[in-house]
UniProtKB/Swiss-Prot annotation:
GO terms for biological process: nucleotide metabolic process; purine nucleoside triphosphate catabolic process. Keywords: Hydrolase, Magnesium, Metal-binding, Nucleotide metabolism, Nucleotide-binding. Homodimer. It is an enzyme of class 3 (hydrolase). NCBIfam families: RdgB/HAM1 family non-canonical purine NTP pyrophosphatase. PANTHER family: INOSINE TRIPHOSPHATE PYROPHOSPHATASE, INOSINE TRIPHOSPHATE PYROPHOSPHATASE/HAM1 PROTEIN. It comes from Rhizobium meliloti (strain 1021) (Ensifer meliloti). This is dITP/XTP pyrophosphatase. Its cofactor is Mg(2+).
Amino acid sequence: MRRLIDKTLVVASHNAGKIREIRDLIGPLGFEAKSAADLNFVEPDETGTTFEENATIKALASAKASGLPALSDDSGLAVDALGGAPGVYTANWAEREDGSRDFQMAMEKVEEALRAKGAVKPESRTARFVSVLCLAWPDGHVELFRGEVEGYVVWPPRGTSGFGYDPVFQPKGYDTTFGEMSAEEKHGWKPGDSEALSHRARAFKLFAETCLGA
């Protein structure tokens, strides 16, 4: 495993909600985090079929364009009754014809698909959020970290915090959705903590322990 020495890196994302969460998680570690959006980098085509492949595509593109280490996140909601969908195509389910993204529409699509399967009771609506972080260097070296959190898809959506599918995901052991939690509650982790709640925080915990010794 390669240690990260630089204190400036690029967040390889154009997703405002994701950039905010990554900055919230990496800020306490003392990093200055620029984003691919801030630097006007072109978004690479995510042609991978796994979270790991897409995270690597994004991180390498930003690392090579900036000459700095880059950190990407590829994440999604995997619903068991839907065979793991939306999965790596989580963002695609939110795409409108004009290219914009509408996650209210995406959540409705998931709910419609579940009802079509007769998945009404909580035990038939199990799901997990997956996050894969990729840390890439300009020389092409990459490190990957995967975090998952188990839960259920609920309906109707609850809460206005977070982003994406957060209002319909209720983690196991909780009676609130990610959309009803503050950022601190959702992640449940800061450097040095032994536990984390969200998928992204669990991936960050591995990243911090492995590449930073934190």
